[in-house]
Design a protein with these regions (language model features):
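C-terminal hydrophobic helical "lid"/dimerization subdomain
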Residues: 32, 251-255, 294-344
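Residues in the short beta-alpha loop(s) of Rossmann-like NAD(P)-binding domains
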Residues: 202, 269, 292
């Protein structure tokens, strides 16, 4: 089969012929990839930022946002059958450890992360687990929802954490209206009554945010802090949901949050630099967000089937992966990049 593999950090990916994955365990599921989402994490992987944390050996196949059709199943799989359309939760959890029992799939003590620490979905086929596949509504196609497996899952996971502080009359600032942010806006609109303020340097992204139901669009041109202060009566927002986490976003977010506010960190790339006395005196809470749970993904698919969440995408054939990554890195993508294998 074909797979786009990383052979050396900072190099372009290569389209290789590799052996097909095989069923080895009773809960294994092999998915024929219909679409794979392109994530900024894939750029960070290419740059070597995940090398030490993942411990993966090169060459390997990235790709952690995947959807397609069940190709083959292990002997104990009962929740899906060959031919079913599925979206793949990006993490394979054991289901038996303490975090799994608590519903914290992403912190499984025995888990693995296809596309991060083992071969992922930039390929014709992907091996995953019965615990990771969500059967899709018949009206949903892989190319339309693949990136929800991480981008959407991460967005809804953060929004669900913020629900308790986003009651009527509250305000939330969304930093970044791109691949993750535009999904987060829709989740906020569907799940909370909060007033949504979106900050982004791109007028196209802000126009999309307006279409998706955001209340205020603020151009990140140097005046954003002053404008957000005016929109929040000088007090700041109850919550910041930061889908950028670099290029000055953290500093902006800290300036836009009200006392006793909650800062949800999703994007990454720079450090959180704030004096501890400010954290204490202002009672600001910083909350990290790593993807989401299986149940989060199931709920997101329900919202999608109801038409409350729509993924805006640009598609590329798998063999054009380096063009797609260049477009992502250059800020030319609106919404999410989607790779389509020739076998889809």
């Amino acid at each position: 089969m074909k797979a786009a593999r990383l052979h050396a950090y900072h190099d372009a990916l290569r389209l290789d012929d590799v052996p097909e994955p095989r069923i080895e365990g009773p809960l294994d599921v092999i998915v024929r990839i219909g679409a794979a989402g392109l994530c900024r994490t894939d750029l960070h992987i290419q740059e070597g930022q995940w090398a030490e944390k993942s411990g993966v050996a090169l060459p390997y196949t990235p790709g952690h946002e995947n959807a397609g059709w069940v190709h083959e199943v292990g002997s104990a799989v009962s929740n899906v059958q060959v031919g079913d359309t599925v979206i793949v939760h990006p993490f394979i959890s054991c289901g038996l450890c303490g975090p799994c029992r608590q519903g914290n799939d992403m912190h499984c003590l025995n888990g693995s992360f296809p596309g991060i620490d083992r071969d992922g979905g930039f390929a014709d086929l992907l091996k995953t687990s019965a615990r990771s596949v969500v059967k899709l509504d018949t009206g949903l196609a892989p190319k339309d929802i693949a990136a929800l497996a991480d981008a959407g899952l991460t967005a809804i996971h953060a929004v669900k954490k913020a629900i308790p502080v986003l009651g009527p009359g509250t305000r939330v600032v969304v930093i970044g209206a791109g691949g993750l942010g535009h999904i987060g806006i829709q989740c906020l609109r569907a799940l909370t009554p909060a007033e949504i303020i979106v900050v982004d340097p791109s007028e196209r992204a802000l126009a999309l945010a307006a279409e998706l139901g955001a209340d205020h669009m603020v151009t990140a041109d140097g005046s954003q802090r002053e404008i957000v202060a005016d929109l929040t009566d000088g007090h700041g927002a109850e919550a910041i949901i930061d889908f950028v986490g670099e290029r000055g976003a953290i500093e902006d977010g800290i300036a836009m949050i009200r006392n006793a506010g909650f800062y949800y960190v999703i994007g990454y790339g720079e450090n959180i630099d704030i004096p501890t006395i400010d954290v204490i005196s202002r009672e600001i809470s910083f909350i990290g967000n790593l993807v989401g749970t299986y149940n989060d993904l199931h709920e997101l698919m329900t919202l999608t089937a109801q038409g409350k969440v729509t993924l805006h995408t640009t598609t590329y054939p798998l063999e054009a992966i380096n063009d797609a990554m260049a477009d992502l890195n250059g800020g030319r993508l609106q919404g999410r990049g989607i790779l389509i294998p020739a076998t889809a």
